[in-house]
Amino acid sequence: MSLKKISLENFTVFSKMEIDFCDGINVFIGENGTGKTHIIKLLYAACQAAQSKKTGIDFQTKIVKVFRPDEFSLLRLSKRGVGASNSSVKVFSNKSNLVLSFHSKFKKNVETTGSEKWEKEFAELTSTFIPAKEILSHSRNLVQAINAGNVDFDDTYKDIISAASVNVSRGPDNERKTKYLRRLQTITQGRVKIENEEFYLLPTGQSQSKLEFQLVAEGLRKIALLWQLIKNGTLEKGSVLFWDEPEANINPQNIPAIVDLLLDLQKDGVQIFIATHDYFLAKYLDARKTKENHILYHALYKSNDSIQHESESDFALLENNSILKQSIDLYKEEVKKVME
């Protein structure tokens, strides 16, 4: 089971868009405002909607919760500047599809189809969205405050706190999990501990000492979050990981280790969706992939007042590659300076 395709019409920045995915790692690149995060949020909402019988939150509601438009109005997510129009979000898997249709002016025209088959196919699916900004250092009572409407965060922040707060996993760590945990612990120099809804880092070899997450560098907190999600069984075979800007606040020297982890998770059956601006992350994925890895790059770009896309399995083959373009421009500037 995996996500295969998304089709959008008159939704946020998109007029018409249809993107096919691979079962492995899908990497979205593009300038700001091209909708990278919008796409992975929609896919996450579709995954979460499969649990609607348990959570009471359907596809339409989850979309509103992850985008948080004014007045929680779905209609505000229609593409602006096109007048009265029909909008739709369609997400396809191997065996089913989930469709949300609505009109930009009429609330009563909202319709969701395909929910029953979708929920049946993905009944056991675990999906996780890691936002660009680290939030675990502010986790104490935050979920309750969000639910009470006292603070304004979209659901991706609340959900990642809930996912990380699961403090146990079934049975002892297997060989695969132990390998991942040791690799990440080499970077963080510690493991995660949860006490009274607070996250701490226990430095390696100092069992009686603990560091509040607020005292740990943000980049290391993000890596510690990965450690916790693997430790508690959230990232397992058959799960889906969405990660917005993995490179944010990460020391560049740790990017290769993150890439190796993502490649191994994919080989172990985790489907991954990433939105990034980082040349090193995108290029390391391309350079270190093996025949066992499946990677598809999706470049989003602006053309004639609309968002277009192209997809390639080879990073260098993308014609509208904003990341590579900036790297080349920088190289030209350096050469010019040397030649002066």
Model-derived features: where do they sit?
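Pre-Walker A-like glycine/lysine-rich segment at the N-terminus of P-loop NTPase domains
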Residues: M1-Y44
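Phosphate-coordinating catalytic segments in nucleotide- and nucleic-acid-processing enzymes
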Residues: K5-S7, A46-L241, S303-E340
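Phosphate-binding P-loop
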Residues: M17-D23, G233-E236, D264
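Residue-level preference for the first positions of well-ordered beta-strands
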Residues: I25-V27, S127, V240, Q271-F273
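DNA major-groove recognition helices of helix-turn-helix
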Residues: L42-C47, A282
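Walker B catalytic acidic pair
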Residues: D244-P246
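C-terminal lobe/lid and adjacent interdomain/linker elements of RecA-like ASCE P-loop ATPase modules
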Residues: A257-E340
